[in-house]
Amino acid sequence: LGDLPLKDQREVMERPFFSLQKRKRLKPIEYRSPDGEAWVRVQAIPDYGMATIWDADILIWAASTLNRMQQQGLNDLPRTLTTTPYDLLRAIKRGTGGRDYQELQAALLRLQTTSITTSIRATKRRQKAGFNWLDSWTFDTDAETEQPRGMTLTLSDWVYEGIVNEKSLLTMHPDYFLLSGGLERALYRIARKHAGTQRGGWLCR
C-alpha cells in the first residue's frame, strides 16, 4: 500500500465480527448492544474455522485500494479486485515465504466461509442481513515453478457497499498491521472508532 492511507469500515471496527485468536474457532460469536438495537451473529464451518482479526487485514487492503480509486475519480468501482499474492502480503506487512502464501489461502477460505447475520445497517426495524466477507476468490500458481502468480477476490455486497460509502470509512495508523495480539488489535479498532482525534479521549465503562 506504500503511503496509501489505511481505511476500514466504522461499523466493522466497533463490533466483534472476528475471532481474536489464531487457533481455529468454531464457537459462534453472539453480540447484542446494550440498547438491544444492534446485534451480530458470526458462525464458522468446521473445515476452516472462523475468520480472524488478522484475516481482516485483507479487507482493510481492499477498502484502502477502493478508496484510492474513488479519490482518483473512478466512478464504477469494481467489486472484484486483482493483485498478486506477493503484493498483497507486502501491503499488509507479512512475510513472503512458502508458509505465508499457504496462510494467505487459508485466510481467503475463512473469509469466504464465515457466515455473518446482523441488524447493523438495517433500514427497517427487525430487518437483518446475512453475508460472507468474500463471495469468491482465485489464486493462480505457475504450473512449472508452483510459484504464486496472481489472485482475485470478490467482495460481498454488504462489504462492498460499506466501503464505497466513503463516509463509513476511517483512516487507521499505518503501524496497525504490526500489532501482534488479537486483543490489541480489537482495542485499537474500538478506540479509533470512538475516540478518533478527540482531545478529551473516550471513556469506556
Where do the language-model regions lie?
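Charged, alpha-helix-forming regions
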Residues: 1-205
